[in-house]
Amino acid sequence: MNTATLNVNVVHESEAQRQHARVKLPGKIRFLGPNRETIEQRLIDISAGGFSFASGKPVTQQGAFHRGKLLFQLDSLGLAMDVEFQVRNLDPESGRTGCQFHGLGAREISTLRQMITSHLSGELVTVGDVICTLQRDNFTEGRARARAWPSRSMFERLRAVSFSLAIFIVGLGAFGLILKQLYDLYFVTHAESGMVSVPSMEVTMPREGTVQSLVGPDGLVANGAPIASFSASMLEMLKGHLSEEQLNPANVEKLFTRQMKGTLTSPCDCKVVAQRVADGQFASKGQVIFELLPRDAAATVEARFRYHDFAKVKPGTQVTFSVPGEDQPRRGRIVSTALQNEGLSSDIRVLIQPEQPLDSALAGQPVEVVIDHGPSYDWLIDKAVTAGL
């Protein structure tokens, strides 16, 4: 096995030293000597870390600090750069002096690097290149070092944790809202309108005359109970039954002045929901006087869907609807579907039978009807029942 002999005299440059390439740029250094005299020497080489010059005989001392100017000739213009440097090594015999820069600014470092890089690549350094280098920002700002967690106070830790928790909660809420909107968009069908419906009955005027209501303040009437009285002239009652001899002016006037009174009775145990003709007003024969609602009638829900949802509103489909004043939604099933007025239209009318009985007093109340055909526990049960499991 061959073993290499270690040479202890080899000096390895550091990373910082390897970054400073020494080049021979034509330039001069001008500074004040120990006796305040002006010293100007030609540069031997220069790098981004320092420079050297030879004066023949020592003009300064090792370790001394000086301020001066680096002078370069670019095109027909001179470039002077203020620098501070320290003498690091000095050869008494040849007068060669090596200096290190101190406190160089960003502009000076950028200019030196531009000149050194252009020289190494064989390019000519022009005034325009130097000006362009000085105009742009060649350095990035240092990253702000955050303080270590143990060095923070309890209040700062609590504030940081609270802020992170608040951001997390807001993000979680936004994510949940987006998921809900997507679910409603693809798995939920909303009815355009809906209301509680109860089959009603109408009481019409048997003869032409005036009407007077007999219904109490609560609007409740029993089957066969009088709900209104009416007055009609005898002439109206006998119209069509008198001969031409009986229709003389004297007889007509006599019959017209005579009034006949009658009553209207309730056909069921009902509640009066509307009175179409006010008390004392004249009503023609066949005109609707009262609209009655049977108290024992089962209330249903009528809803209107778009024709586009035709496949989703089939009879037997389970729906959910909400009634004003109730906290929990109710459930029901579609009993029948039909187009409006039994003709072609842009919407479908559906009749919904609630699973739990609805109070008939809710007749006419608006409801919100929703069909949820997305994955859920009930959806899994329905699928299992359909499959015969």
Swiss-Prot record:
Q: Which family does it belong to?
A: Belongs to the Alg44 family.
The subcellular localization recorded is: Periplasm
What domain of life is recorded for the organism?
A: Bacteria
What Gene Ontology molecular function terms does this protein carry? cyclic-di-GMP binding
GO CC terms on record?
Answer: periplasmic space
User: What is the designated name of this protein?
Assistant: Alginate biosynthesis protein Alg44
Alphabetic keyword roster: Alginate biosynthesis, Periplasm
Main function:
Required for alginate biosynthesis.
GO biological process terms on file: alginic acid biosynthetic process
Domain (PilZ) spans 17-117
**Transmembrane residues, as ranges?**
none
Enumerate the PANTHER family for this protein.
MEMBRANE FUSION SUBUNIT OF EMRAB-TOLC MULTIDRUG EFFLUX PUMP (PTHR30386), MULTIDRUG EXPORT PROTEIN EMRA-RELATED (PTHR30386:SF19)
Pathway, per Swiss-Prot/TrEMBL? Glycan biosynthesis; alginate biosynthesis
